[in-house]
Amino acid sequence: MKFFGWMQNKLHGKQEITHRPSISSASSHHPREEFNDWPHGLLAIGTFGNKKQTPQTLDQEVIQEETVSNLHVEGRQAQDTDQELSSSDDLEEDFTPEEVGKLQKELTKLLTRRSKKRKSDVNRELANLPLDRFLNCPSSLEVDRRISNALCDEKEEDIERTISVILGRCKAISTESKNKTKKNKRDLSKTSVSHLLKKMFVCTEGFSPVPRPILRDTFQETRMEKLLRMMLHKKVNTQASSKQTSTKKYLQDKQQLSLKNEEEEGRSSNDGGKWVKTDSDFIVLEI
């Protein structure tokens, strides 16, 4: 049995694992299946053949690999837990609970001192800032950051105080204005009612008639409206005057043309009875 198992492992490229009990148990569950696979792997000459693995053998190999990996993981976890326990035991042996309490108190003191800076340290930082700025010219952003970190607490407190004062003042002003408006409304209502009653009972004629509102008074003319009105008036007058001048010029031109025509006709009638030498010469030449 062992010999056959060793030969099978050699053929499939497996190494023998002797220190794992799970592998031996898994192989003992299926001895008959292993014997059934052997005759197919043997050739007629007596040598072993490289036959393909059947699905049953593949399943067995997968199961063996999984068990081996699980065992490795469990072993590592056990080693880690042992190391942690040993380290905790060493710490407990080195420090007593009183010393641990003292260490915790010192740590808390250091943290509180670091978080709360004194004003003297802040003033020292502010005093040393010009030197820092001169020596580290490119690190001006760091200097500004230090200034802001040093003064942010005081500025925040001042801002909160100013905001609270402003809010209180605004509330007081709003309450005073509300009270004044209420008083004014009451006084107006009282005076108006008393005035009306006096007029009703004292005046014999009753209420005086209300004057009708004038449209001109309601719609008061502005300077621009006045200027526009003047411009329109001038334009209308200029257009009328231009029309009159054009008609006058047209009539005068007609009269001048008629006079010229009459003069030309008179001249032509006067020149008709005169003898012209050119006519006589022309007649003699024709004869």
Curated annotation (Swiss-Prot):
Segments of this protein annotated with the region Disordered: 15-36, 71-99, 236-280
Signal peptide range: none
Cellular localization per UniProt: Nucleus
Known tissue expression: Specifically expressed in roots. Expressed in root tips. Expressed in the endodermis of inflorescence stems and hypocotyls. Highly expressed in the lower hypocotyl and root stele of young seedlings.
Motif (IGT motif): 41-47
Compositionally biased intervals (Acidic residues): 81-97
Gene Ontology biological-process annotations: gravitropism; lateral root branching; regulation of growth
Cysteines paired by S-S bonds: none
Extent of Polar residues compositional bias: 237-259
Null mutant phenotype: No visible phenotype under normal growth conditions. Roots of plants lacking LAZY2, LAZY3 and LAZY4 exhibit a negative gravitropic response, and grow upward in the opposite direrction of root gravitropism. Increased branch angles of lateral roots and reduced length of primary root.
Presence of the UniProt keyword S-adenosyl-L-methionine in the record: no
Spans traversing the lipid bilayer: none
Domain of life the protein comes from: Eukaryota
UniProt main location, coarse: nucleus
Family: Belongs to the LAZY family.
Miscellaneous field: Plants overexpressing LAZY4 exhibit steep lateral root angles, upward leaf curling, shortened siliques and narrow lateral branch angles.
Name of the protein described by the UniProt record: Protein LAZY 4
Native organism: Arabidopsis thaliana
Lineage: Eukaryota, Viridiplantae, Streptophyta, Embryophyta, Tracheophyta
Gene: LAZY4
